[in-house]
Each structure stands twice: as C-alpha cells, then as structure tokens.
Curated annotation (Swiss-Prot):
Changing D432A: Abolishes cleavage by caspase 7. Changing K264R: Reduced acetylation. Complete loss of acetylation, 15% less transactivation activity and slightly reduced DNA binding. Residues 3-57 form the MADS-box domain. It comes from Homo sapiens. This is Myocyte-specific enhancer factor 2C. Changing S36R: Found in a patient with infantile onset epileptic encephalopathy and autism spectrum disorder; likely pathogenic. Phosphorylation on Ser-59 enhances DNA binding activity. Phosphorylation on Ser-396 is required for Lys-391 sumoylation and inhibits transcriptional activity. Acetylated by p300 on several sites in diffentiating myocytes. Acetylation on Lys-4 increases DNA binding and transactivation.
C-alpha cells in the first residue's frame, strides 16, 4: 500500500501545526539516535519552535559536541532548505511533496502504537458488524387477530346468523345494533301501486340458527329476549322503511309468501285456492311445531310525543310453557284467512277501526304472511284490551270472533287514519296527518308495532295493561 503524499508547506491551523511539530520532532530525534548507533557518530540537535522555545538532542554531551564545533576550522559540508530541495529535485522527487510523516515517525512503528492501532481496528470492525446487524429490517411481529362476531352465548341482532345456545342468557342489545336490525339492509320495497303482480319472497329456510327477516333470532333457539327501554324508541325514529319478512323461518322450504303491493284504490285479489293452500301449509307447519304463547309484561311508557306515543317503550318477552296453542286453535284463528294473527294478543279499537277499512283480500294475505312469521318469532305487542281474545285451553274454540272479513266494508277510507301496515312505515317520522298517505302505502310489514293517530293518542280509552298471570279474557 503506497504512502499518502502531503504538500510541504506551512500549516495554517495552529493546533494541527503543534501536533505535527511534536510528532516530527520525535521522529527526527529517533533518526539521529539510529544514525549515531549505526554509524558510531556524535549528533547534536538544536531546535527552536515558532515561539522561540528551545528543544535539543545530543547523542553524548551537548557541551562537548558544541566545543568541537567551535574549534573545527577545516572545510565541511553545510546544507540549508534550498539545498535539500535541490537535491530532491535531482533525485526525481518533488521537493514540495513528501511521504506521510506518520510512516516515518517512531510513534507509528513503536510496539505500543501498533498494539493501540490494532485495538482500534478491532473496535472499528466490531462497530461495523454491529451496524450491519442493526441495518437488517426488523421482522414483522404483527399477528392477525380474529374477533368473533357472534359467540355461542351472545345475541347480536345485526348478525343474520347469530345463534342462542344458552337459554338463561338475557343479553342487552346495543342501540346501534338495534338500529341496524331495523335498517333496510334486509328490506325489499314492494312494487308501486301501478303494478298488479305480487312480491314473491325467496324460499323459506329451516335453519336452526338463522334469523327472521326482521333481524331477530329464531325463537326456537332464543327462549328469552330482553330489549332495553331506550332502544325501541330509536328503532321507531329510524329514517328507514320497515323490513319485510321475506326470510321467515318455516319447516316448509318450498313455501313462498305472496305479499300484495300497497295502494289506495287497487289491491290485487288472490283466489281462494291459493288462500286455502297457504292456510293448509301454515297449519301443517304449526302442527309440526307448537307455538308457545309468550307472557308479555309491559315496561315503562314513554311520552306521548316520543317513540310509539303512549304505548310501552320496551317489551320484555319471556317464553312460558304453561300456555300453549294446539294446531286446532291455530287453525281456528284463521277465521278470516288468519288475518287475526296480525296481533295475536289483542286488537285495539284504533286497530279495529283501520282493519275495517281494509279489503278482505289484503287482510287475507296479511294474515297468511303474519301467521307464518308468528309461528316462528314471538315478537308480539299487547298495547290494550279489545275484542280478539285467546283462551289457555288447548281445544276450546276462541271467543268473540268479530273481525271476520265478511263484516268488513268493501270501500276504503284514507282520510280517517292509517292502517297498521301503513302506520308502521311512518313510525320513523312525525305523525302529521293524512297528507303522507301517497308515500306511505307502498310499505307493508306484519310486525305488530303500531302507532295511534293524534286524536286517539290523547284519548283516555287507550290504556296500558300489565299482564302478569296470563292472557286477558
């Protein structure tokens, strides 16, 4: 490896100049020592630095060498800097350039210096190796975490495949989840009034853990449901149409539900053969699976201007086994083509008023749809006590059948109020009159959550009733 060349000029940096002077002074004395030993001569060095500080070196005694110098009168060799530069030029070397002084100094070649440099080199190599290790990109420690949406012991209303395995668990539904259950994610708008064809739903599934079309779990796997009081009002205030029960659970997978489109003046009629076929299949499915009538307790009411307006703000539904309906009772309930299954518990005076205003074909189809839904889901509402009553005896026929389709008038009233299927679609907004009938009649839902008109909302006849022992008779 070649030596680094430096330019022989005055060093401008004071510190660098001082370091270079100390190093080269020691190198010069080392060379004088080697020369005196190797060649058996006497050498004396006298050095003054830039601050006129004296540094001297003598191979023997300085005074003795200086005495010889003063007494010597014969011709002798005397050189200056210019002579050295000229001699270097003749040898082919540039006088302004010189090898690295570190290579000539004794400091760089002493055993102590070599050990120190060796240690420094080892430290540098170790540091470089550490830097290479640190330069390697760190491994990815991210671990995928899967969060289960539904568990075996939890009920999520927004999950369409959630299951309930623990019959003793009564979960509280989150407001956002309750709002999701009423969202139009599972809804299908029926065709407009101009269309004469009905809305055909998909095949009804019989899965044990699937949910109904309204987002609630299958009652076969959910013996107890508890809805928090503040969430029902949020559902009624949601700006979305109510969901249609197109995915109702049933044991007949080939059964299709025909839901007529909503209109004011034209309601498509269905033949009696289709009605009898639907009722026969519904009765067969209900006889194969008995319906446990729920014991409904009415919770804290809300203000008249909020939520359902005078109706209970939450319904705590528990499934009792002491009251059950047989297939004979359920078949007798279809007196007007199972239209009484719209409200299995009781029908208020306001509800009867609007049920009288509906044509029998619409009532027959609503009964055929809602009875299938009520056979699988027990989300019932019992807001007051009126005519339709069910006794607890399994074989006795029901009493007070006053809501048959033969007693309904064939004309339709639109200015008096809304029908239950129309009032549910307008439950998310303010009940401001009959000017919204043109927009509300196209939504239909068999859910029994209704809302009174403004004139009947303040009526003292509409009262709440707590049912603790059984059904009202």
């Amino acid at each position: 490896m070649g030596r680094k060349k430096i330019q022989i000029t005055r060093i401008m940096d004071e510190r660098n100049r001082q370091v270079t002077f100390t190093k080269r002074k020691f190198g010069l004395m080392k060379k004088a020592y080697e020369l005196s030993v190797l060649c058996d001569c006497e050498i004396a060095l006298i050095i003054f630095n830039s601050t006129n500080k004296l540094f001297q070196y003598a191979s023997t005694d300085m005074d003795k060498v200086l005495l010889k110098y003063t007494e010597y009168n014969e011709p002798h060799e005397s050189r200056t800097n210019s002579d050295i530069v000229e001699t270097l030029r003749k040898k082919g070397l540039n006088g302004c350039d010189s090898p690295d002084p570190d290579a000539d100094d004794s400091v760089g070649h002493s055993p102590e210096s070599e050990d120190k440099y060796r240690k420094i080199n080892e430290d540098i190599d170790l540091m470089i190796s550490r830097q290479r290790l640190c330069a390697v990109p760190p491994p990815n420690f991210e671990m995928p975490v899967s969060i289960p949406v539904s568990s075996h012991n939890s009920l999520v209303y927004s999950n369409p495949v959630s299951s309930l395995g623990n019959p003793n668990l009564l979960p509280l539904a989150h407001p956002s989840l309750q709002r999701n259950s009423m969202s139009p994610g599972v809804t299908h708008r029926p065709p407009s009034a101009g269309n004469t064809g009905g809305l055909m739903g998909g095949d009804l599934t019989s899965g044990a853990g699937t949910s109904a079309g309204n987002g609630y779990g299958n009652p076969r796997n959910s013996p107890g449901l508890l809805v928090s009081p503040g969430n029902l009002n949020k559902n009624m205030q949601a700006k979305s149409p109510p969901p249609m029960n197109l995915g109702m659970n049933n044991r007949k997978p080939d059964l299709r539900v025909l839901i007529p489109p909503g209109s004011k003046n034209t309601m498509p009629s269905v033949s009696e053969d289709v009605d009898l076929l639907l009722n026969q299949r519904i009765n067969n499915s209900q006889s194969a699976q008995s319906l446990a009538t729920p014991v409904v307790s009415v919770a804290t009411p809300t203000l008249p201007g909020q939520g359902m307006g005078g109706y209970p703000s939450a319904i705590s539904t528990t499934y009792g086994t002491e009251y059950s309906l047989s297939s004979a009772d359920l078949s007798s309930l279809s007196g007007f083509n199972t239209a009484s299954a719209l409200h299995l518990g009781s029908v208020t005076g306001w509800q009867q008023q609007h049920l009288h205003n509906m044509p029998p074909s619409a009532l027959s189809q609503l009964g055929a749809c809602t009875s299938t839904h009520l056979s699988q889901s027990s989300n019932l509402s019992l807001p007051s006590t009126q005519s339709l009553n069910i006794k607890s005896e399994p074989v006795s026929p029901p009493r007070d059948r006053t809501t048959t389709p033969s007693r309904y008038p064939q004309h339709t009233r639109h200015e008096a109020g809304r029908s239950p299927v129309d009032s549910l679609s307008s439950c998310s907004s303010s009940y401001d009159g009959s000017d919204r009938e043109d927009h509300r009649n196209e939504f239909h839902s068999p859910i029994g959550l209704t809302r009174p008109s403004p004139d009947e909302r303040e009526s003292p006849s509409v009262k709440r009733m707590r049912l603790s022992e059984g059904w009202a008779t």
